[in-house]
Structures are given as structure tokens and as C-alpha cells.
Amino acid sequence: MLGAALRRCAVAATTRAGPRGLLHSARTPGPAAAIQSVRCYSHGSQETDEEFDARWVTYFNKPDIDAWELRKGINTLVTYDMVPEPKIIDAALRACRRLNDFASTVRILEAVKDKAGPHKEIYPYVIQELRPTLNELGISTPEELGLDKV
């Protein structure tokens, strides 16, 4: 019902005619624009860090994961306000290798470097933790490929 009221307000605002008969948006909001905000709190339990890590490791370890699910998982993981744990990145890199998707491996490593932001010690730590996996899977870092100089 709230969505319908918002749609009516948006339609009414965009269909008002100006002096020459042209459509323009209204400068002053109508009475329907005075909708109060509603707080939507979840009363569910909070996910612990261990549960979060296990959920993502399980997601990337699915044997039947396809390229779309891999990219969706990576995109969702990147939207969180944190740097993923090395074990999550390890599982994602292994999923990329199962799908022979080298471009996604580079993208994951670049995203980790970007998420680390000004904290210059995080990315080298993650690479150090992932070095055995990178060597095992034959994955080069963006720095080894020269992509950091582009």
C-alpha cells in the first residue's frame, strides 16, 4: 500500500503541465510526499564472524557452481564493508579455477587490494596467506602481471 502511494505521488509530480503544456517535475512536494519513515528492525539473531566465513566458504565450494553464481557471490562479497578472510578468498579462487575463469581471479585480488584501502598491511598479509593456493593453482597476482602499473 505504501508503494502504491509513492507511485501515485511520483506519477502526479511528473505529469503536471507547465505554462507551455510541457511536462516538468513539481517544485513543491504534494501532500503524499509527507510520508513518515518506518523503522524496520530485524529481531533475528546476529551472524557471527565464524558463521559468516563458513557460509561464504560453503557457497564457493559448491561443486556445481556456475560462472553466474561465482560472479554474483563475488559482487555480493565486495559490497560488504570489510576485507574477506583469506579462507573465503581461497574458496573463491578455487571456484574460479574449477570454472577456468582467470579473469575473475585477478578481479578478486584487485577487489581485496581495493577493499584494504589505506591500510597497506592488509593486502600483503592476504597474499602471504594465499601464496600456497596461488602457487598450487598457477594464479599470478595483479602485481606479478604488471597490472598495478597500468
UniProtKB/Swiss-Prot annotation:
Q: What keywords are assigned to this protein?
A: Acetylation, Heme, Iron, Membrane, Metal-binding, Mitochondrion, Mitochondrion inner membrane, Phosphoprotein, Transit peptide, Ubl conjugation
- Its membrane topology: Peripheral membrane protein
Query: Which molecular function terms from Gene Ontology are attached?
Result: metal ion binding
Superkingdom of the source? Answer: Eukaryota
Q: Which GO terms describe its cellular component?
A: mitochondrial inner membrane; respiratory chain complex IV
* Sites bearing Phosphothreonine, chain numbering: T141
User: Which pathway does this chain act in?
Assistant: Energy metabolism; oxidative phosphorylation
State its location(s).
Mitochondrion inner membrane
Please give the InterPro entries that the UniProt record associates with this protein. Cyt_c_oxidase_su5A/6, Cyt_c_oxidase_su5A/6_sf
What is the recorded post-translational modification? In response to mitochondrial stress, the precursor protein is ubiquitinated by the SIFI complex in the cytoplasm before mitochondrial import, leading to its degradation. Within the SIFI complex, UBR4 initiates ubiquitin chain that are further elongated or branched by KCMF1.
A Pfam family of this chain = COX5A
Positions of short motif SIFI-degron: 2-17
Biological processes, Gene Ontology terms = mitochondrial electron transport, cytochrome c to oxygen
Quaternary structure, per UniProt, is: Component of the cytochrome c oxidase (complex IV, CIV), a multisubunit enzyme composed of 14 subunits. The complex is composed of a catalytic core of 3 subunits MT-CO1, MT-CO2 and MT-CO3, encoded in the mitochondrial DNA, and 11 supernumerary subunits COX4I, COX5A, COX5B, COX6A, COX6B, COX6C, COX7A, COX7B, COX7C, COX8 and NDUFA4, which are encoded in the nuclear genome.
Its family remark reads:
Belongs to the cytochrome c oxidase subunit 5A family.
Its function, per the record, reads: Component of the cytochrome c oxidase, the last enzyme in the mitochondrial electron transport chain which drives oxidative phosphorylation. The respiratory chain contains 3 multisubunit complexes succinate dehydrogenase (complex II, CII), ubiquinol-cytochrome c oxidoreductase (cytochrome b-c1 complex, complex III, CIII) and cytochrome c oxidase (complex IV, CIV), that cooperate to transfer electrons derived from NADH and succinate to molecular oxygen, creating an electrochemical gradient over the inner membrane that drives transmembrane transport and the ATP synthase.
Protein's recorded name: Cytochrome c oxidase subunit 5A, mitochondrial
Organism field: Pan troglodytes
